[in-house]
Amino acid sequence: LPDPAFEAWRAGFIAKAVAQGLAEDQVTAILAGVQPDPHVLELDQRQPEFSKPISSYINGAVSAGRIAGGQARIAADHLWLDPIVNRYQTPAEILVAIWAMESAFGQLQGDDDVVRSLATLAAEGRRKTFAEDELIGALRILISGEAVRTQLKGSWAGAMGQTQFTPLDYLAYAVDEDGDGRRDIWGSAPDALASTANFLVKKAHWRPEQSAQIEVAVQIKAFDYTLVDGPAKAPADWAALGVTPVDPRGLPDPDKGVDAALIMPMGWQGPAFLAFPNHMAIRAYNNSVAYALAVGLLADRMAGGGPLVQPWPADQPTSLADRMAAQQALTRLGYYSGEVDGLLGSGTRKAAKLWQASQGLPADGYLSYALIQRLNAQAGTAATIPAAAT
């Protein structure tokens, strides 16, 4: 049976698409028979019960098999990859790392119908503007004939192709690298990687020759850890504060005059990095510190670099209940006034820094499982999910 709410959304969306210059009969035909995808709704609304430490994600991403696979692709595909690298001044290793992360070198592009996925997200309403704008982009691709509906397969969130472009990014940045007259990010690896390079340069402002991140160590005991995740500074200023590269050769020359932020994804006991503007360029592709670090570290290993000097600390996963209880504790203690949602974002990290400083702890903002238990004990909160969140 038709979903009345979805049908109301469909009618309103068709009117919006027509107002943006699309033909009503074409839009109606493409959307005919489209119904909400329960699978997409479930994935969009689900928050994992347990959050693995970032170390688990990065160790999985920067695996020996993926490093070797990337090196093999760079060697085998240099005839078409080298011209892309030269034209866009983006390293082959970065492009191939993104290719590996997004689709296992084109093998796993997702099989969800992009039109249906975006229609589902738009009608659900939580990300209506984003989903409707991207859906109009998908309609433009289909109406222009650049792709057919059976090609528009991708992730449940609407990303598609070998390097997982959204429809609007496809329209703006996809290129025809192999010269066959089509911007085929699904079937043509040269088109997909050239499109990614074009995106990194034009939208994300990739800086040639510069690093994405450099592993560093804090050389002084009295370091001010509130500087973690703070404003970027010149490497010389970081060095004056005791933050220096773990590589005894120091920073590569192109990085020496470039401001960088200090990040410690698992706190002061784990690896530390100077994150340069190219780290943020990767985050423009996928706005996740973990993703950008994984791409940068994977690229470094493909280029012959060694593993991290500072190992990741052993830390057990935290549950949604743990994280919500930590936010409740920070609220009760007067450090946090944001939403209790289990998402430990910048607001929670700032609050955690204040609490850590009050306890004489390194104020890096990272809440390990052990620290969450200590925080809860102090505030008298427990790891129970409020009824409103279940």
Model-derived regions: residue spans:
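Acidic/His-rich structured neighborhood in mature extracellular/periplasmic domains
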Residues: 54-201, 212
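Flexible, glycine-rich surface segments
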Residues: 149, 153-161, 166-284, 310-311
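Secretory-pathway/luminal and periplasmic proteins that interact with or process carbohydrate-rich
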Residues: 36-43, 103-113, 124-128, 144-150, ...
